[in-house]
Amino acid sequence: MNILFISLGCDKNLVDSEVMLGILAKDGHQMVDDETMADVIIINTCCFIHDAKEESIQNILEMADMKKTGRLKALIVTGCLAQRYKEEIIQEIPEVDAVLGTTSYEEIAHVIDGVLSDSPMERGDVRLTMKDVDYLPVTDTHRMVTTGGHFAYLKIAEGCDKHCTYCIIPKVRGDFRSVPMEHLLEEAQNLADGGVKELILVAQETTMYGTDLYGEKRLPQLLRALCKISGLRWIRILYCYPEEITDELIQVIKEEPKICHYLDLPIQHASDGILKRMGRRTSRAQLIETIEKLRREIPDIALRTTLITGFPGETQEQHEELMDFVDQMEFDRLGVFTYSPEEDTPAASMPDQIPEEVKEERQAELMELQQDIVFDQAEDRIGEELLVMIEGKVADENAYVGRTYRDAPNVDGLIFVNTSEELMSGDFAKVKVTGAADYDLIGELL
């Protein structure tokens, strides 16, 4: 069968998509990019915030229209939206032939067989394919990498135990479950054997890896084992909760040359009052202490964070506290979301909800401040010599685009490398920074 696969949402969802693609390829199916050529369309959805939910629904409705042309035989919906709104999707969008939960994606080949069956009973059996939300699928480690082949994500855990008051993730992804280390090492080896040079560790919270399986945090041990895999040049860590960062983890990052001096710290806010309302397990003082320790121990570390502005009850004074914190900390990378009320979360029913226009004003103020910080940092980089991973060629120019260790794919900046030499995606090149443009750098090949 010709299958069109649409993957929405975060990098963790993308890993699930790649696992499903690997299963389908092994089962003999062909992947296509054109919906008019597809016999089956699979949509892996997201519902983390309102905009993500709307994007998922719009994609489902657009693909449902394809069934009217006659070629499309089946439409399958999986992922977080499917887990959260399974009954509503079945009832309100009859064009959807099957709904798979977040822990059922390993059943994708069986579900396709079912929806294409001539038997009404078999079609009915797979219409709603759900396993316990705390089940941990551990499948064949041969994924179909969709990120270009030179970098890939490694999902080291599923679910979350934090239960922040604004977040729906524990309801749709279950409690925190670590993937066994031996499985991760096998998967990483397969990725390296396939040409992957940068491995990016993801989970809802990477810093808690191992606590459920081994009774202790095992991220440092996992990192040391991954560093022994030949072929890997960079290992990057995302989604590190600041309060869970240990001295042992910092030491591993310092000692292992393959580990990028880069951490993603999703702090969300810096006012103690808002942190408490969010259900976060840290304070402004603790955040400052952790950030200062990281910079003291690893002076060239790049720190990325994400913030939520306009949380229920956020006063102008608390917003200014956050502005002051951002100004003081000078993060290398920063993203700001406006608070999105999600049904079935405590924050959605909290008093003092903030008007949308106020949220957007505060978001703009934070991003304007961060822009000034990043522009100053970029100017300071001019003259530096950096190792760059090449992502691809700039069309019709003697230039390439790449990333430094300070830049995670899709969320951070880029560096444009001027050269007439022939380079390939995944190549590493030494580049001298000669200029800056907004969030990006410009350089020349050395």
What kind of feature is each model-predicted range?
Residues 261-262, 275-276, 287, 299-302, ...:
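Extended hydrophobic-aromatic, low-complexity segments
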Residues 164, 184, 201, 237, ...:
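Conserved, mostly hydrophobic/aromatic
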Residues 1-209, 248, 259, 263, ...:
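Proteins enriched for Cys/Gly/acidic motifs involved in redox and nucleic-acid/cofactor modification
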Residues 47-48, 173-174, 213-216, 276-282, ...:
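Short glycine-enriched, charge-decorated loop/helix-capping segments at active-site entrances
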